[in-house]
Structure formats: structure tokens, C-alpha cells
Amino acid sequence: MMIGSQTARDKLGSQVPDIKLKLAGTGPLLEQLKSQCPPNAEFLGFKQGEELRELIHNASFVVVSSECYENNPMTIIESYMIGTPVIGSDLGGIPELIIENKTGYTFKPKSSDDLKETITKACSISEEEYARMSDEAKKFAMDNFSEESHYQKLIKNYQLIIDQNKR
């Protein structure tokens, strides 16, 4: 499970010790965070490209535990494109990208207890439910964020402008 933010680390590692937490990224609080994390947390540092895609692919879920407003987190779209469902905080544009129980789950921002409950729920679904969720996440990304989807929307908008100017 890939995870980030203070909320995710507060109690989660000690409350859910059988989950391996993989934290990707860097920043000025890295050393402080390392000292606060449980033994089941692994800091991976900055990742990008194929290495990041491989981490997302191998994760059961990607946790986007933002505590500030994000409009359209690319992490969610990248995860969906790979077929990895997302657990995200119910804040900013995140809940607009997560279809509850279909492409992932949301939890209350800054609530490590709610995050723990959501992760526990996510980890308890059947293999069939997980496969369906993975397929739905990928379909959602392809339908809304693929090149083809973008081109079709762009063509539709251009056609609308052309049609309006014909009048």
C-alpha cells in the first residue's frame, strides 16, 4: 500500500501492523516523519517513471491522504490508468475522482481513525470485488483521461463553436 501525509502515519502503522506501508516522496519533513513511523513503514524516496508505475502496479491500493485542497491529483489518475484503486481523503477534487465502492474509497480528512477503518474495509473485500474495482478504476481513467477521450471532447467543443458561428 502506498501512502503519505501525517494523518496516514499518525496511528495507522501501529493500528494496522500487518499492512506494509510504502511511502514515496521527499520533502523538508522527511527525517521527522521517519522518526514517527512504525517498523512496517518503508521510505522509498522520490520515484518517477517506470519505477513509480511499478510501485503503483504492485500496490493493493494507493492512499492519497492529502490534508490540503487538491483540484485534480495526478496520482489518482495514474493509479487508475494502471488499474490500482485509490483510498483518498474527502477533500478538494479528490472525491470527484473516486466513485465510492467502485473505483476506491474516501475517508474524512485528518482522521487517522477513519483512514484506518477505510483501509481495513478495503483490505477485507474479496478477490472478485477487488478485480471489479480495479477494472472500474481503469475504465474510469480511460473514459475520462485517455488521449482518445481528450481528443473526442476537444473535437466536440470545436464542432460546437463551428456550428454556433454558422448561424
Locate the predicted segments by residue.
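Nucleotide-activated donor-binding/catalytic signature segment of Leloir-type glycosyltransferases, i.e.
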Residues: E31-E50
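Short alpha-helical donor nucleotide-sugar binding micro-motif in glycosyltransferases
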Residues: F46-K47, L55-A59
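Acidic donor-binding loop of glycosyltransferase active sites
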Residues: H57-N71, T84
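Short glycine-rich donor-binding/catalytic loop of glycosyltransferases
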Residues: E67, T84, G88-P95, P109-S111
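Short acidic/histidine- and often glycine-rich active-site loop of Leloir-type glycosyltransferases
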Residues: I77, L91-N101, Y105-T106
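Conserved acidic donor-binding segment of nucleotide-sugar-dependent glycosyltransferases
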Residues: E100-N101, Y105-S112, K121-E127
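A short, well-ordered alpha-helix in the C-terminal region of glycosyltransferases
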Residues: K121, E128-N144, H150-K156
